[in-house]
From Swiss-Prot:
Amino acids binding substrate: S138, Q148
Underlying gene: Hpgd
Family: Belongs to the short-chain dehydrogenases/reductases (SDR) family.
One term under GO cellular component: basolateral plasma membrane
Provenance organism: Rattus norvegicus (Rat)
UniProt key word Lipid metabolism: yes
Swiss-Prot/TrEMBL keywords: Cytoplasm, Fatty acid metabolism, Lipid metabolism, NAD, Oxidoreductase, Prostaglandin metabolism, Tumor suppressor
A Pfam family: adh_short
Record-given protein name: 15-hydroxyprostaglandin dehydrogenase [NAD(+)]
Reactions that this protein is recorded to catalyse: prostaglandin E2 + NAD(+) = 15-oxoprostaglandin E2 + NADH + H(+); (15S)-hydroxy-(5Z,8Z,11Z,13E)-eicosatetraenoate + NAD(+) = 15-oxo-(5Z,8Z,11Z,13E)-eicosatetraenoate + NADH + H(+); (11R)-hydroxy-(5Z,8Z,12E,14Z)-eicosatetraenoate + NAD(+) = 11-oxo-(5Z,8Z,12E,14Z)-eicosatetraenoate + NADH + H(+); lipoxin A4 + NAD(+) = 15-oxo-(5S,6R)-dihydroxy-(7E,9E,11Z,13E)-eicosatetraenoate + NADH + H(+)
Amino acid sequence: MHVNGKVALVTGAAQGIGKAFTEALLLHGAKVALVDWNLETGVKCKAALDEQFEPQKTLFIQCDVADQKQLRDTFRKVVDHFGRLDILVNNAGVNNEKNWEQTLQINLVSVISGTYLGLDYMSKQNGGEGGIIINISSIAGLMPVAQQPVYCASKHGIIGFTRSAAMAANLMKSGVRLNVICPGFVKTPILESIEKEENMGQYIEYTDQIKAMMKFYGILDPSAIANGLINLIEDDALNGAIMKITASKGIHFQDYDLFPSFSKAP
């Protein structure tokens, strides 16, 4: 799929990786709906983008992705405004081991909800024109992390759900591809949360160990993750792919044993 001329919806779009995604999509000719819970940051992001791109290329919508009604209304507003939806990036996420239920709600449940909403609008079965959904997990979704067990569980869940949903979308001939990006450590505000007790709870004593891991693995710039996003969108052969992006290896993919390719019975 070529990005130029397409309509994208990005959650958690006002800062960090989400902002980098938005900028990359705009640079490649897409129109982008910026979805974020932070009104002030979202308005500032939209204003900054308006100085570089035509204002009509972007739409900012304040939304708490954990609120199902707000999320449904957001998708409707985007399609009403731009007339279509081609690219969905479920990027919003938090790191909070203390309020672990909220972490699961934002990191996993909202991704599942967003994916199903995206399929409702994009699937050819529903009169859509197909498209692509990219869910943002983490390297923590592929390994155990003693200091962040709930965050780790949420990111594992994204991978299992997306791979399964990708198989289902293919069986249903929906015309929608689903893929995952698993970044390593990225220079974003979420990294600052590892030093806050209100985020880490009982695991705050392991902050130095996390910092040592960051030093060992290196820290990526958000633009590196945005490059991976564009690659996933433009490679039509990728469905159910797990793209890993690390400072040491750059973009590479997780290998899995192949499952049988079941097709619908005639």
